[in-house]
A protein has these predicted regions:
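NAD(P)H cofactor-binding loop motif with strongest signal on the N-terminal glycine-rich segment
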Residues: 13
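C-terminal substrate-binding subdomain of Rossmann-fold SDR/epimerase-dehydratase oxidoreductases
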Residues: 16, 20-24, 191-313
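Adenosine-cofactor binding site in Rossmann-like domains, unifying the SAM/SAH pocket
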Residues: 26, 30-50
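NAD(P)H-binding glycine-rich loop region in Rossmannoid oxidoreductase-like domains
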Residues: 45-85
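Conserved catalytic-site region of short-chain dehydrogenase/reductase
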Residues: 70, 105-121, 136-142, 154, ...
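Conserved Rossmann-fold NAD(P)-dependent oxidoreductase catalytic core, especially the SDR/UDP-sugar
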Residues: 89-134, 160
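Flexible, glycine-rich beta-alpha linker
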Residues: 111-113, 136, 160-182, 209
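Active-site Tyr-X1-5-Lys
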Residues: 132-165, 184-194
Length: 313
């Protein structure tokens, strides 16, 4: 489906992925809807109902969500559950009710069971309880998948759900209390370098592994999925496993920090291992995202250093 001439709604347009997605869509001849939270409260049925009835978007790219790192998820699990559950249900329902042709949504890769053999396959997604550090967020986001399946079965409504790996890149949230691992570490190492600190303290022991996906690859995948007439969910990553220790060494190198790294083993590692089998995504779309971690980190460091005055910190 070409987006040319379509009315395209991007939820979460001012957020990390949303900002990058909107930047990409600026070159497409479509009517682009990017409402602020004051214009469209995605947790309010009254607000969502009215907005969709007034604007009748033909394509909905549902990127919005209440997101954060381990600390934020452990501190506010109820808030993470409520906001994400409401968004998950309302956006899909009112898109269908008002005649949208397609919805593409981002769910949560952390919804996979905590104890699972890697690489993760989509048919394992419901085989156990997710990691307890982010269960409120993870379980709320699973509503997107149930809704996609059930609305396709009953109404023939076309929506697709993606399970992104750990995302990073320009326009990310660099707030140390609410950010994810990559932006938090980039900020910590840059500040340590600039202030001449002898050491940087990081959580865990570095043994946990993750899969890191550059935001430009994420945007490309979302747009390609507009043409996929399947619910999924589909893993969205690179298929490459990276330990937190490797990640930190990459960030240290890109930043140019020469001090010591101190591991605070009293803090949780989170889920032990997580990376994806990307065969289903490749079957559906025909490629696998492939920006090397070192390239993506370098671009993110450069963006942050050039935009500290406007970055979310």
């Amino acid at each position: 489906m070409s987006l040319e001439g379509k009315t395209v709604l991007v939820t979460g347009a001012s957020g990390f992925v949303g900002t990058n997605l909107v930047n990409k869509l600026q070159s497409v001849d479509c009517e682009l809807l990017t409402p602020s939270s004051s214009e469209l409260d995605l947790t309010s049925e009254e607000s969502v109902s009215k907005y969709f009835a007034d604007k009748t978007p033909e394509v909905v790219l549902h990127i919005a969500g209440k997101v954060g790192g381990i600390l934020a998820n452990k501190t506010y699990p109820g808030e993470f559950f409520h906001k994400n559950a409401m968004m998950s249900v309302l956006v899909g329902h009112y898109a269908w009710l008002n005649g949208a042709e397609k919805v593409v949504s981002l769910a949560a890769g952390c919804g996979y069971p905590k104890h699972l053999q890697v690489p993760y396959r989509e048919d394992q997604f419901w085989d156990g309880f997710p990691d307890e550090n982010s269960y409120g967020y993870s379980l709320a986001k699973k509503n997107l998948i149930v809704q996609s399946w059930s609305y396709r079965e009953q109404y023939g409504f076309d929506s697709t759900v993606l399970l992104p790996a750990n995302l990073y890149g320009p326009h990310d949230n660099f707030d140390l209390e609410s950010s994810h691992v990559v932006p938090a570490l980039i900020r910590k190492f840059i500040e340590a370098r600039d202030e001449g600190r002898d050491e940087v303290v990081v959580w865990g022991d570095g043994s946990a592994s993750r899969e890191f996906l550059f935001v430009d690859d994420t945007v490309e995948a979302i747009l390609k999925m507009v043409d996929c007439n399947e619910s999924g969910p589909f893993n969205l990553g690179t298929g490459v496993e990276t330990s937190i220790k490797e990640l930190i060494e990459t960030i240290r190198s890109c930043v140019g920090y020469e001090g010591n790294i101190v591991w605070d083993t009293s803090k949780p590692n989170g889920q032990p291992r997580r990376f994806y089998d990307m065969s289903e995504f490749e079957r559906a779309v025909g490629y696998i995202p492939s920006t090397p971690l070192s390239d993506g980190i370098s671009k993110t460091v450069k963006w942050y250093e050039e935009n500290r005055s406007v970055a979310r910190i």
